[in-house]
């Protein structure tokens, strides 16, 4: 047979031998073919020519297939790294869950005066500064336009009052779930307004005028070796009703402080290196039995003071307010 002939039956037999003896040289395959099929293959060189034809055909097919998939690449990842915001100041007052217009003014005044007397140089507004219940799924009567304006005006009035009490302090506002309800409502019900920055809290409340920085809910505060956030992304499900601080520990395995739960709690454990890990939840500064949760008896008024040392170590004063007194 000439090297240019292409008998199908011979090609089929050669392909079977290639699959059966992978890695063998063409000469070895030719000898196996002659030994196995002496009536079909009788010459080493002619058999090698058939093998070259078959392997070139297979190779071309593989090359075409590989070239096709060479055009594919991994899609660009949109994954984001966890974001932190470091507070460099060392004497911090934590106020959270004020829920304007349902705030407790007496408790707010006590907490802020406590900070003023101790020369705090930073205030963390730990989320849910506004209530925004009409913008969520809770059963609530729809607000009038005047009510909505009042929500913003009252919140701005509070921010102005707070700045007047501590004019040189850094103020950082962490977005809470109630703060975010307005944006979620706009996104679903009024997307045109959602796309207008004027209706976002930082602009609508003139935060720049009061030198207040607003952090979105996914950003984590870092105060020395202590971390913090509003808490609604931390204590979900079964943890909140039992011991919020323990739920924070189970979730974060870090020194961590939250608001959100409207109750003061603490939990500490040590790791295998005997490093102490502490977690806290801070009480609220608003009504204790809101209309959407009228039977709750676990809420308490409270705030916290955090003192950070130069090496990052810290102390947390997790204060309660009971019958007009700080305890």
Region spans (language model):
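Conserved beta-sheet core of the metallophosphoesterase superfamily
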Residues: 226-319
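Structural motif
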Residues: 90-92, 121-124, 226, 255-257
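DNA-recognition alpha helix
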Residues: 28-40
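Major-groove recognition helix of helix-turn-helix-like DNA-binding domains
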Residues: 39-66
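Short, amphipathic alpha-helical "recognition" segments used to contact nucleic acids or chromatin
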Residues: 6-24
